[in-house]
Amino acid sequence: MQAPPPEHCPGVESEQAGLVSACAGCPNQSICSDPSKKLEDPGKALVAAAMKDVKHKLLILSGKGGVGKSTVTTLLTRYLARSYPDNNFGVLDIDICGPSQPRLLGALGENVHQSGSGWSPVGIDDNVCLMSIGFLLGSVDDAVIWRGPKKNGMIRQFLSEVDWGNLDLLLLDTPPGTSDEHLSVVSYLRDDNAPESLHAIIVTTPQEVALLDVRKEINFCKKQRIPILGVIENMSSFRCGHCGNSSEIFPAKTGGAAAMCIEMDVPLLGSLPLDPLVTRSCDAGEDITAMRNETTEALATICSKIMSSL
C-alpha cells in the first residue's frame, strides 16, 4: 500500500517524480523514481472504456484568464455543428470553479439524468451535447470551493461516467493556466498508442501580458506531448458600429500572436474580432453562426483548418 503523498508532491506523472527535494523521506520515493514500479491509475482504464467511441479530444487552453477561451469554445462548437451536420460534437466544461458553458450554450437550468450507462449529457442541438458541473449545482450562484484532489475526482467522473455515445469531436473547455485540472485531464486522455486522438488549441489576445502566459502553455503542451493544432488570437480588433472604423483594443506591442507563433513554431489558426454581437448572444445563450459577418467569416477559416488537421 502506498503512503499519502507529501505536501509538495510533484505528482506521479511528473518527470520529477521521486527526484525533487519534496520527495525526500517519502516512503513512495523509490516507487515514483522507478518507472517499472509505478502503479497504473485504475481510473485510466475506466476513462478509456468510456471514451472508446470518441474519435478526437480537443483541449481549449489559455495561459491567461479573461482572453475569451470559453466564448471561443462556444463559437467553435456552434460553427462546427452547423457546418458539419453529419458529425457529432460534445463539450466538456472542466473549469470546475467557474463553469460558463451552460450559460454560453443556452442550457441554464437544465438537469443531468442518470441511466444504466452513466450520466446523460445535456442536448444542445441535434449534434451537440454538453456536460458541466454547472448542471450539478443547486444555484448558478453557488461557489465551488474545492482543493485539487476533489477537482480531479470530479474530472475523472466526467470522463469515465458520462455516456457520450459516438462523438467525432469532444471539446474540453479548461480553466486558465497549467493547474491540477490540466494535469489530471491530460493524464487520463493521453494515449501513447493513439497520440493523434488528443490535441490542443490555445487562445490568446494580442497584448504581451497574455502572450507571456501563452508561451508557457505551449511549453506545457510540448512537455506533455500534446499536439497543438494552433493558436487563435481573440479580440484582435474592434470595428465601430457607427463609423465602421477598426481599432485595436489590445495593441500588439511585440507583433501579437502571429509573431509569437513564428517564434514558438506553432500554427496560427486565425484571429477573431471583439464583436459586441458575440457578447450579447453568448450572454443570452443564442447562436449567431448562421449570420454572415466578420466573426463568422473568421470562424469559417479556423474551423476548416481544425477539421482538416484531425
Curated annotation (Swiss-Prot):
Molecular-function GO term, any one: iron-sulfur cluster binding
Cofactor-binding details, from the entry: Binds 4 [4Fe-4S] clusters per heterotetramer. Contains two stable clusters in the N-termini of Nubp1 and two labile, bridging clusters between subunits of the Nubp1-Nubp2 heterotetramer.
Subunit note: Heterotetramer of 2 Nubp1 and 2 Nubp2 chains.
Binding site residues for ATP: 63-70
Biological process annotations from GO: iron-sulfur cluster assembly
Alphabetical UniProt keywords: 4Fe-4S, ATP-binding, Cytoplasm, Iron, Iron-sulfur, Metal-binding, Nucleotide-binding
UniProt-annotated location(s): Cytoplasm
Functional description taken from the UniProt entry: Component of the cytosolic iron-sulfur (Fe/S) protein assembly (CIA) machinery. Required for maturation of extramitochondrial Fe-S proteins. The Nubp1-Nubp2 heterotetramer forms a Fe-S scaffold complex, mediating the de novo assembly of an Fe-S cluster and its transfer to target apoproteins.
Family the UniProt entry places it in: Belongs to the Mrp/NBP35 ATP-binding proteins family. NUBP1/NBP35 subfamily.
Binding-site positions, [4Fe-4S] cluster 2: 240, 243
Organism phylogeny: Eukaryota, Metazoa, Ecdysozoa, Arthropoda, Hexapoda
Cofactors demanded by this protein: [4Fe-4S] cluster
Gene source species: Drosophila virilis (Fruit fly)
Span of the signal peptide: none
Protein name: Cytosolic Fe-S cluster assembly factor Nubp1 homolog
Binding site for [4Fe-4S] cluster 1: 9, 23, 26, 32
InterPro entries documented for this protein: Mrp/NBP35_ATP-bd (IPR019591), NUBP1/Nbp35 (IPR028601), P-loop_NTPase (IPR027417), YlxH/NBP35 (IPR033756)
